[in-house]
Amino acid sequence: MDESLLRFDKKQKYLVFDTETEGLNLIRSRPWQVAWLVVEGGKILEKHDMFLDWPNLDVSAGAAKITGFTMEEYNKRKESPRKVWEKFSKHLYDEDTFIVGQNLLGFDVYMVNIWRELMKLEADYSYVERIIDTRALAVAIAKDIPVDKDDFISWQYRLINHRERKLKTSQAFLLKKYNI
């Protein structure tokens, strides 16, 4: 077994996150929920599930159905986007932390930028080079595609855009397949 693999580095820190949004528009849909874990050595150091308070939030019927969104729950739990950002961004921009998630490169990085824009912050994608997108990894495993270690981020972008009928890469499928 290759001891240099990330999974053997018990001091490596990971930020695992996901956003829920008003819809699928990569330019305008606002993230209304962000959930994240900070993990080191197999131990969860932090666990958050926070709602962002935006005026006139308009979650599409499809997004509400998929995410279980209700305005009642949202109104109970919503917090200042800046307050949530302060907690979240310290991990996102920590250069010693790898960032992990399903389809982060295809969706969530855009939602993070919308969040920043709504708070009048400049775009900052400096964290993207540290992303490990589990959708890209799932495609690579399913199709037996070797990793491009020299240009890992471009390799992941190519794979998240791979489309093939009956190729299963959802988190639910992967968790079941690998008994996680």
Predicted regions and their residues:
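Conserved non-catalytic scaffold segment of RNase H-like nuclease domains
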Residues: 1-119, 125, 165-179
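Short acidic, glycine/Ser/Thr-rich loop/turn "cap" segments at secondary-structure junctions
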Residues: 94-99, 138, 155-159, 180
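Internal, conserved structured core segments that host functional sites
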Residues: 96-97, 104, 117, 130-142
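Short alpha-helix plus adjacent loop in nuclease-associated cores
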Residues: 131-162
